Amino acid sequence: MSRSVGSLASCYAIGLMALWAGVAQADQGPGAQDQGADQFQGVAPQVSGIPTCFDTNHVVLEINNIQVEYWKTTTPNQFHSRAHVRGPVVRIYNDHSGHNHISVQIGRTADVAIELIYNQEFGALPDLAVGAEVETCGDYITSTAQSGGYPASPDGAIVHWVHRSTRPGHESGYVAISGVVYGY
């Protein structure tokens, strides 16, 4: 069964990449070379000064926007994994209980977004504006329904633990806003 799910995930990701690459080519006109498609192909170059993101097995985790988008639409509430996403801020939610809540676009349109939850105990974030470029590494959770005391995310999924780890055996995360790293 996992083999067929993996195959389905691969087909879905390949289809998204083809769609996005085609849209990017169309946006630039015939014969144009796509300069920004790497953001949507699951692998992107690291910006200097930004830490390496690791999965739960301490393997380098490249930008995985496509995988995260797939998880959002196919996994049950409270599914957990690691995410390393990059995109522009599309909404800024009210801060509460010492956390910033930021909606970051991970797909081709603003409605394909994930809620980034940043713990202010690891330092203040700058004043944010819609359009600011964000890269983040942390724990992904599908959040489509309330779980315990936590409400569902307005984006249907979250990335949290986006700061240095205070727990042995748990990978660190971070938030980079316009190339400046926070929480690490």
PLM region descriptions:
Residues M1-Y12:
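Bacterial N-terminal signal peptides that target proteins for export
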Residues G22-A26:
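Sec/Tat signal peptide C-region and signal peptidase I cleavage site
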Residues D27-Y184:
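OB-fold and OB-like single-stranded nucleic-acid-recognition modules
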